[in-house]
Amino acid sequence: MEEITINIDKIKINDDWKEFLRDEFQKKYFLEIKKQYLNAINQNIIIYPPANLIFNAFNLCPLKEIKIIILGQDPYHQPNQAMGLSFSVPKNVKIPPSLNNVFKELQNDLNITPAKSGDLSSWAKQGVLLLNSILSVEANKAASHSSWGWQEFSDAIIHKLSNEKSGLVFMLWGNYAKNKEILIDNAKHLILKAAHPSPLARTGFLGCKHFSKANEFLKKVGKIPIDWKIV
């Protein structure tokens, strides 16, 4: 697989985000991530998403325009699904059950007809950071990179955004994401919590109205609301 034979240092990341995260890239834990990544490549292990998409969440969502963070756990581990955006899958890929429930809630909340595509890139381009807590996974092995140190990286991003920005919306779905609430200053930002949209989760996601609540908050703080229709 040509796309995974790339040193993590060579993977493109938007310049503004690169500067924002410069200190994290120099820390011991991130050097360990790079080491683990290269070791996996040298063993010809297939990693998702493809290397050029590992930082896709940052490349599509401009730092200066960030408004909302939707936190996922780790990438899809089946072929052709992971694209570096939490919950998102490429066009023409079957929409996963959790994302189906997200679309159902959009219909309930804002009367948006469920999309035929699961590609959420249009959200990212408007300022929605679709961030997975863990940024890579071995093919067919869910949560296989959970010990690499990615959580320290994503926690640092959440905490730094909370400290340096104001008027952001953090959507925390499921207990894993809710545990990140301690990283966020709720005096400066809106924290929206709900059950995970997975059909396996207990009821509590459908009816949360997070999308309308987020847009109401954005308007309140003088920001342009998100057009949640999938383009």
From Swiss-Prot:
Enzyme class, first EC level, given as a word: hydrolase
Active site feature: 74 (proton acceptor)
Source organism superkingdom: Bacteria
Catalytic activity: Hydrolyzes single-stranded DNA or mismatched double-stranded DNA and polynucleotides, releasing free uracil
Record bears the keyword tRNA-binding: no
GO BP of this protein: base-excision repair, AP site formation via deaminated base removal
Annotated CDD domains: UDG-F1-like (cd10027)
One family name in Pfam for this protein: UDG
Enzyme Commission number: 3.2.2.27
GO cellular component: cytoplasm
Keywords carried by this UniProt record: Cytoplasm, DNA damage, DNA repair, Hydrolase
A molecular-function term among this protein's GO annotations: uracil DNA N-glycosylase activity
Compartments where found: Cytoplasm
Chain's role: Excises uracil residues from the DNA which can arise as a result of misincorporation of dUMP residues by DNA polymerase or due to deamination of cytosine.
Family: Belongs to the uracil-DNA glycosylase (UDG) superfamily. UNG family.
Name of the protein in its database record: Uracil-DNA glycosylase
Gene: ung
